[in-house]
Amino acid sequence: MPRPFPRPRLRSTAAVFTTMSALAATSLITGPSAAEPFSAAACALTRTEAHHSEGVDTWNAAYPQPTRTLDAVMVFLSFPDATPRTTPDQLAADHFPATSRFFEQASYGRFTLRPHPLRNWIRMPRPSTSYVIERDWSASHRADYLRDALAAADGQVDFSRYDVVYFVADPDAPGVDSDATKVVNLDTPMRADGTDIRRVVTVFEQHPPDRLVLAHETGHVFDLPDLYHRPVDGKGDWDTYVGDWDLMGSQFGLAPDLFGWHKWKLGWLDPRQVTCVGKPTRLTLEPLGAGPGTPVAGRPAFGLGRGTKLAVVRTGPETALAFEARSPAGNDAGTCKEGVLVYRVRAGAASGGGPIQVIDAHPHTEACWEASVYPPLADAPVALGESFTVPGDDVRVEVEGRTVAGAWTVKITP
């Protein structure tokens, strides 16, 4: 997961051009508009062979689907070349209940991640420096680390009881690199207690850790891709694809709730909460972060949670445009700007290759410089009273009003 780098103040000359115009209909309205009754399946992109493909037509059975309670074991690893200065309880508290709370809110209560942290350190057989831990870890050193960790823990852990495995290293050991935290996917699974272990989250975070870092890595366990852009030389801005708008882009984002597309993929949205738009359509979009009873920007906490969360326009065999409302609610409580967010989805793009890219409705301005991970996209949503035509696709969205509960009324014209 990337750490923040200095951000350039100048906008890229490659910024997209938009057409903005004010709308007259900005008053509150009390009820939803009629949505075009197209089946969500008509806009469900097909899952491809790309790593962590954004296809939503089927679930990849190689990954656990987070639509029930899943159990996660946290194994704390110490090394002969260091005496831990923290306790397993302290490290567990770095990540829980924050990680479970994030997923509870993101899933509208449909998924619970239940942690099972060990209460003691488990000693690795070799010094931390011998594993040459780093971000771009060599396969041989990584294999040594995982093999030793599994062998050391197997006497104390029944791995057959758990859906997710976290190996948490002593953050103060000299060979531990906090930039190396990641999910390791194994072509040949490790075997313990009669069960295959196909992926492990290797945690090397400092104490205290980066915000929501474990939630980001756990997203990979559920087949979600990296949405950040990694510069070839390691320098420059990592957040040009999605900015603050999804945890899989940055765990530091102001609005880190998972995209509606990801909630659809994970099984947290009912088909009726996704509208496939094939002709001019008026509909009401609930704020993505609002579950049943969740207040939205001080508005009453009623009437939201089970309505439409995502509108989709199919643009090609492997591409689509997605529209969702982002307001200060739930995991998005700290959002910089609210409105209707527009983004492109590419099912054929692999993790890290831009499978989702936010489209900036205000390409000549930026916002929240002091807090945003990428200010040029912090004001990307189409605001109340604005219209926006998506460059290259000629799809227009008009944000016409708000309901008393805080939902957004929009018209989408493909």
What is each stretch, according to the model?
Residues 1-35:
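Secretory targeting and sorting signals
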Residues 75-80, 168-172, 224-227, 249-253, ...:
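Active-site-proximal beta-strand/loop segments in catalytic clefts of secreted hydrolases
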